[in-house]
Swiss-Prot record:
Membrane topology: Multi-pass membrane protein
Protein family (similarity comment): Belongs to the UPF0316 family.
HAMAP family tied to this protein: UPF0316
Name of the protein in its database record: UPF0316 protein lwe1794
Membrane-spanning intervals of the chain: 4-24, 36-56, 62-82
GO cellular component, one term: plasma membrane
Organism field: Listeria welshimeri serovar 6b (strain ATCC 35897 / DSM 20650 / CCUG 15529 / CIP 8149 / NCTC 11857 / SLCC 5334 / V8)
Keyword vocabulary terms for this entry: Cell membrane, Membrane, Transmembrane, Transmembrane helix
Length: 174
């Protein structure tokens, strides 16, 4: 590999690393993991300085600038994929059943989730409203389980800002 191609590849890879760490650090900061975010920012800055100095020292080659820019975009995607895998934090899942079903909360509790339920009125009559707080890593699995029980359920999830008190199930059954 000649020196020019080596620099292009190095800039590309280093910028992917930099932006991946940057993206994860930003998400850690937003989730309140301040010490982990601070530690990752140290590595982020070291990698950033290396990547930027490589580009600035070799500005005469447009391929270096393109490698930097493309590496940046790829780094954002990689960082988001990593964050999806880590799935930090909790979500609140609100479920409105298609029909009133008193047994539905118990079926979901039997799967290992904590459920609060109440009667709701919809256009076509009574429904059941459920609120479930769970770890984000369980979101897709919970959606599938709810749909298996009530295929017509309306499901919405959101991230709570703070959590205090309440009833917690220790672990969702695999």
């Amino acid at each position: 590999m000649d020196n020019g191609l080596f620099i292009v590849v190095t800039i590309f890879v280093v910028n992917i690393l930099y932006v991946t760490i940057y993206t994860v650090r930003l998400l850690l900061t937003m989730k309140g993991y301040r010490y982990l975010a601070a530690l990752s920012s140290v590595f982020e800055m070291i990698i950033y300085v290396v990547a930027l100095s490589l580009v600035l020292d070799n500005l005469n080659n447009i391929a270096n600038v393109l490698a930097y820019a493309i590496g940046f975009g790829v780094g954002v995607i990689v960082g988001m994929k990593i964050e999806e895998r880590i799935a930090l934090g909790y979500i609140t899942v609100n479920v409105i059943t298609k029909e009133y079903n008193l047994d539905l909360p118990n079926q979901i509790r039997d799967l290992g989730y904590g459920v609060t339920s109440w009667i709701a009125s919809g256009r076509d009559g009574e429904r059941m409203m459920l609120e479930i707080l769970t770890q984000r890593k369980n979101e897709r699995k919970l959606y599938k389980q709810i749909i298996e029980i009530d295929n017509g359920a309306f499901i919405v999830s959101s991230e709570p800002k703070q959590i205090h008190g309440g009833f917690w199930i220790k672990q969702v059954r695999k």
